[in-house]
């Protein structure tokens, strides 16, 4: 009995630290009238939100504001091969949807159109009224095939796929999305004064024009074995020229790679497919996190030295090489 009792109680020092932390949280919650709750697909219950109305800080639902928060700010890998590993197919799980009022501008969004080997579609069409995420710096458009072992594609980490003011637990076919979560912000109830002046202007709905002040660039890919253990991803330069992606990279790197291939006449010059592979010397992380500095320009000052071809190409020093078995000779 004595040893069993010892197992059920916290050590004295740990109990003191835990008690102190609990009191700090309670006092902080009392002092700050803006608690933040994160909703994932495992905690999404309307009844929980309704119960907040009966508590001290929230007197009406007008104080409850929903915000979509993107995952990319946490430093997750955003390249297509890495991102697709975070998504998986499941059967027998009903999808969940929640709306949100405001969101962030996303650096990386995705748009998938995947078919099974028999030609049938892997992903469902979006429900009526569901539109793509409206603010994307780069849209990674992926087409390809895969086993798709399940009815619907979910996020393995329990996150949402953010669309235009709508978050869903599943991926919809051909609809642009960003990865994220939904946060519910409880605002303090404003004091009402009968002499309060009317607004100087009516509020503006900034989501009407999804392209205003924001340049979107679409990057295209071909993927095989989507949803399987080992997938293969090719970056599409044009209809006959591709680059094999074998390690993490940034979208800025792909933009520069695309321009380098075109400027140096490295595109396929026939109807055959030319596939390039990256030289191991290349560092594909150029421009990492540059979007925190600015979101509205194309980073023109980034150095090209690591990607540019020399005037006289040495076969042993070139930074790109055609894949063995390619049936299309490159231009001289």
From Swiss-Prot:
GO terms for cellular component: extracellular region. InterPro entries: GPC_FiloV, GPC_filovir-type_extra_dom. Disulfide bonds join 109-136, 122-148. The keyword Membrane does not apply. Glycans are attached at residues 41, 205, 229, 239, 258, 269. This is Super small secreted glycoprotein. Keywords: Disulfide bond, Glycoprotein, Secreted, Signal. It comes from the Viruses. Residues 1-33 form the signal peptide. It is found in: Secreted. The gene is GP. Pfam families: Filo_glycop (PF01611). Belongs to the filoviruses glycoprotein family.
């Amino acid at each position: 009995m004595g040893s069993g009792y010892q197992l059920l109680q916290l050590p004295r020092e740990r109990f003191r630290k835990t008690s102190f932390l609990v009191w700090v949280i309670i006092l902080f919650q009392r002092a700050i009238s803006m608690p933040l709750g994160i909703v994932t697909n495992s905690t999404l219950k309307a009844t929980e939100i309704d119960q907040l109305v009966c508590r001290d800080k929230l007197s009406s639902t007008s104080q409850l504001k929903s915000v979509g928060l993107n995952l990319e700010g946490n430093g997750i890998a955003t390249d297509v091969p890495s991102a697709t590993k975070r998504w998986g197919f499941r059967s027998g799980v009903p999808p969940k949807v929640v709306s949100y009022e405001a969101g962030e501008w996303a650096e990386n969004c995705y748009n998938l159109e995947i078919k099974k080997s028999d030609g049938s579609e892997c992903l469902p069409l979006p429900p009526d009224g569901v539109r793509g995420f409206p603010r994307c710096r780069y849209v990674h458009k992926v087409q390809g095939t895969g086993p798709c072992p399940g009815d619907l594609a979910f996020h393995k980490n329990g996150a949402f796929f953010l669309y235009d003011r709508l978050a869903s637990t599943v991926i919809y076919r051909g609809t642009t999305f960003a990865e994220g979560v939904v946060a519910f912000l409880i605002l303090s109830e404003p004091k009402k004064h009968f002499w309060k002046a009317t607004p100087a202007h009516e509020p503006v709905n900034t989501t009407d024009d999804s392209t205003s002040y924001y340049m979107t660039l679409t990057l295209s890919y071909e993927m095989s074995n989507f949803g399987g253990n080992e997938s293969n991803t090719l970056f599409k330069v044009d209809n006959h020229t591709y680059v094999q992606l074998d390690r993490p990279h940034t979208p800025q790197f792909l933009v520069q790679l695309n321009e380098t291939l075109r400027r140096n006449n490295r595109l396929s010059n026939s109807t055959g497919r030319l596939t390039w592979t990256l030289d191991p010397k290349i560092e594909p992380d150029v421009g990492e996190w540059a979007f925190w500095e600015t979101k509205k320009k194309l980073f023109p000052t980034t150095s090209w030295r690591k990607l540019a071809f020399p005037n006289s190409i040495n076969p042993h020093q070139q930074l790109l090489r055609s894949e063995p078995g390619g049936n299309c000779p490159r231009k001289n």
